[in-house]
Amino acid sequence: MLLQPACSPSVFPRPSAAPSAMHGSQKDTTFTKIFVGGLPYHTTDASLRKYFEGFGDIEEAVVITDRQTGKSRGYGFVTMADRAAADRACKDPNPIIDGRKANVNLAYLGAKPRSLQTGFAVGVQQLHPTLIQRTYGLTPHYIYPPAIVQPSVVIPATPVPSLSSPYLEYTPASPAYAQYPPATYDQYPYAASPAAATSFVGYGYPAAVPQALSAAAPAGTTFVQYQAPQLQPDRMQ
């Protein structure tokens, strides 16, 4: 007959406390923990605590520092004793702490973004070519990213990728001008004579004359006028 050794209850470890009991000991800081950003680098835990003491009791005030250098990273966390104190501390979203404007918000909400002042000017590169063509009557070949779609805006004299379009490959030295009488030269974006280049008609979007044209006609103005509706693609080929 085999005898089983008696085992005392002390041999086996006692079961640990239930997880709910352990989590119950931790206090909920959802509405009491405050994120403080925009702090100056000389702010310490003591100075951060000193500022928030005016709103109520504080359980913890910590400035986050860099592990390697030990310097402040510009933000920290403050845990208030109750929710009412946290609400009073967050009433001013941009207080002055240690001589610098900071931003304060509940930690679970994250950093509160500052208001951005958006302008009404819209760049050409932000608009779809189809929308520009329908609204302003311009073709995609005459859409220049550096400019704003507004009247009386001068396009800067910088190299623009759209100027390499096949519609603008005519130069004064090209024999293509011999195929057209002088009266038809005004139909093209670049005028053949300096006198024709001095007038501004059409949409009012002047552009800089390329170097080849400025060398051939030094007496003309540095801006010529595009006439997009008068272009004929079959004559450009």
Swiss-Prot record:
Its main location: cytoplasm. GO terms for cellular component: cytosol; nucleus. CDD domains: RRM_RBM24_RBM38_like. It comes from the Eukaryota. Keywords: Cell cycle, Cytoplasm, Differentiation, mRNA processing, mRNA splicing, Nucleus, RNA-binding. It is found in: Cytoplasm, Cytosol; Nucleus. Residues 1-24 are annotated as: Disordered. Expressed in cardiac and skeletal muscle tissues. Gene3D superfamilies: 3.30.70.330. Residues 32-109 form the RRM domain. Pfam families: RRM_1. SUPFAM superfamilies: RNA-binding domain, RBD. The keyword Cell cycle applies. The keyword Cytoplasm applies. GO terms for molecular function: mRNA binding. GO terms for biological process: cell differentiation; mRNA processing; regulation of myotube differentiation; regulation of RNA splicing; RNA splicing. RNA-binding protein that specifically bind the 3'-UTR of CDKN1A transcripts, leading to maintain the stability of CDKN1A transcripts, thereby acting as a mediator of the p53/TP53 family to regulate CDKN1A. CDKN1A is a cyclin-dependent kinase inhibitor transcriptionally regulated by the p53/TP53 family to induce cell cycle arrest. Has the ability to induce cell cycle arrest in G1 and maintain the stability of CDKN1A transcripts induced by p53/TP53. Also acts as a mRNA splicing factor. Specifically regulates the expression of FGFR2-IIIb, an epithelial cell-specific isoform of FGFR2. PANTHER family: GEO13361P1-RELATED, RNA-BINDING PROTEIN 38. Belongs to the RBM38 family. This is RNA-binding protein 38.
